[in-house]
């Protein structure tokens, strides 16, 4: 007789425990119901990238000393640096610099270890093309600065926080919007 009673008690405890778990998960589901939607209409609305976002690499040809530190610290030896040794002044002269963004993993080591700060990360993330050979950027393509998403009047940016008061005296940048 007692084993049957303990079996019913165990069944009752398991039923109560299951109902509690279902109730807890239902409460979590309901708590997400009052949040704002996360989906944005991408080509027309763009989210503002963070300050530390690793986008396309910007290269300044005049600052580069062809030391090849960027190639040595790159985990996949990606940047291609072509240089010639000028014997009269005994310095390297940079001829060509290119990065293939189809292979780049955007780790940022080249930017971090560059001694002359000729490399920097931009907020540009739209690098998609139909031909993978178009992702091989030379020093001319790397030297172009992308148009800022914040300053682009054709795109409506999505601010992740609630209404932010921005004074029009200061220029818009990612720091004034996120603060």
Curated annotation (Swiss-Prot):
EC number: 7.1.1.-
Binding site for [4Fe-4S] cluster 1: 64, 67, 70, 114
Gene Ontology MF term list: 4 iron, 4 sulfur cluster binding; iron ion binding; NADH dehydrogenase (ubiquinone) activity; quinone binding
4Fe-4S ferredoxin-type domain location: 55-84, 95-124
Broad class of where this protein is predominantly found: plastid
Record has Metal-binding as a keyword: yes
SUPFAM superfamilies referenced in this protein's UniProt entry, alphabetically: 4Fe-4S ferredoxins
Catalytic activity: a plastoquinone + NADH + (n+1) H(+)(in) = a plastoquinol + NAD(+) + n H(+)(out); a plastoquinone + NADPH + (n+1) H(+)(in) = a plastoquinol + NADP(+) + n H(+)(out)
Cofactor binding, note field: Binds 2 [4Fe-4S] clusters per subunit.
Disulfide bond sites: none
UniProt function note: NDH shuttles electrons from NAD(P)H:plastoquinone, via FMN and iron-sulfur (Fe-S) centers, to quinones in the photosynthetic chain and possibly in a chloroplast respiratory chain. The immediate electron acceptor for the enzyme in this species is believed to be plastoquinone. Couples the redox reaction to proton translocation, and thus conserves the redox energy in a proton gradient.
The name this protein goes by in its record: NAD(P)H-quinone oxidoreductase subunit I, chloroplastic
């Amino acid at each position: 007789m007692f084993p049957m009673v303990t079996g019913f008690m165990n069944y009752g405890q398991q039923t109560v425990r299951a109902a509690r778990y279902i109730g807890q998960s239902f409460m979590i589901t309901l708590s997400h119901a009052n949040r704002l939607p996360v989906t944005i209409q991408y080509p027309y609305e763009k989210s503002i990238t963070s300050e530390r976002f690793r986008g396309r690499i910007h290269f300044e040809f005049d600052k580069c000393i062809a030391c090849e530190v960027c190639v040595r610290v790159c985990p996949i030896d990606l940047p291609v640096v072509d240089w010639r040794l000028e014997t009269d002044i005994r310095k390297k002269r940079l001829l060509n610099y290119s990065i293939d963004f189809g292979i780049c993993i955007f780790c940022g080591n080249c930017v971090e270890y560059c001694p002359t700060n000729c490399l920097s990360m931009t907020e540009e993330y739209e690098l998609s093309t139909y031909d993978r050979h178009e992702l091989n950027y030379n020093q001319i393509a790397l030297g172009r600065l992308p148009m800022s998403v914040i300053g682009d009047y054709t795109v409506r940016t999505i601010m992740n926080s609630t209404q932010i008061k921005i004074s029009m005296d200061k220029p818009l940048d990612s720091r004034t919007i996120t603060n």
